[in-house]
């Protein structure tokens, strides 16, 4: 079974809660015999690794701009997941979850991990908060499996 991970900046050694979660989780899943590929945002990557602890790594260029970065990367990553034959796309965070229907339309099963209500953070304006809430809704209503992380 091929699992492709999207919604994270990347691993290893990239700062962030989602990133730390993924750095711990996916090597363990790969060790159990699953084929795991994690798609990283090239602008955050400081190495040229193609693998980390049995997790394959693919880097995709993404503009490093707060308001569009996650959604552009997720679009490209889901498309890449389809082209490399993913059975499951594991989407992390509510922003990237906005594109859950795209992955489902492309015929992949989707697992969504909700890392918290990002729309409650002060760094986002009204429009961004609305989009994040929509992403949360898409991630919890149109996936194959949901994982809520408190």
Give the ranges of each region predicted by the language model.
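Conserved small/polar residues in nucleotide/adenosyl-binding loops
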Residues: 146-150
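Extreme N-terminal starter segment of soluble prokaryotic enzymes
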Residues: 1-3
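Short glycine-/acidic-enriched loop or helix-start segments at secondary-structure transitions
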Residues: 15-16, 47-48, 69, 99-101, ...
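Membrane-proximal helix-turn-helix segments that form the acceptor-binding/catalytic region
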Residues: 79-82, 105, 129-145
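Conserved donor sugar-nucleotide recognition element shared by glycan-biosynthetic enzymes
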Residues: 18, 70, 132
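An aromatic- and histidine-rich active-site surface loop
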Residues: 71-78, 82, 86-119
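N-terminal strand-loop element at the rim of the active site
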Residues: 6-14, 21-22, 28-65
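A short, charged, and often flexible helix/loop element on the N-terminal side
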Residues: 52-79, 121-128
């Amino acid at each position: 079974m091929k699992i492709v991970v999207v919604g994270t900046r990347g691993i290893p050694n990239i700062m962030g809660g989602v990133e730390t979660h993924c750095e711990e989780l996916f090597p363990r899943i790969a060790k159990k015999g699953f084929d795991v590929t994690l798609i990283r945002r090239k602008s955050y990557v400081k190495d040229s690794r193609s693998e980390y602890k049995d997790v394959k790594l693919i880097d995709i260029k993404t503009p490093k701009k707060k308001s569009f970065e996650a959604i552009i990367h997720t679009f490209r990553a889901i498309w890449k997941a389809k082209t490399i034959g993913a059975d499951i796309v594991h989407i992390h965070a509510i922003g990237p979850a906005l594109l859950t229907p795209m992955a489902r339309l492309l015929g992949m099963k989707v697992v969504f991990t909700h890392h918290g209500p990002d729309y409650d953070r002060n760094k986002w304006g009204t429009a961004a908060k609305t989009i994040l809430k929509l992403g949360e809704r898409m991630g919890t209503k149109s996936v194959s499996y949901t994982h809520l992380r408190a």
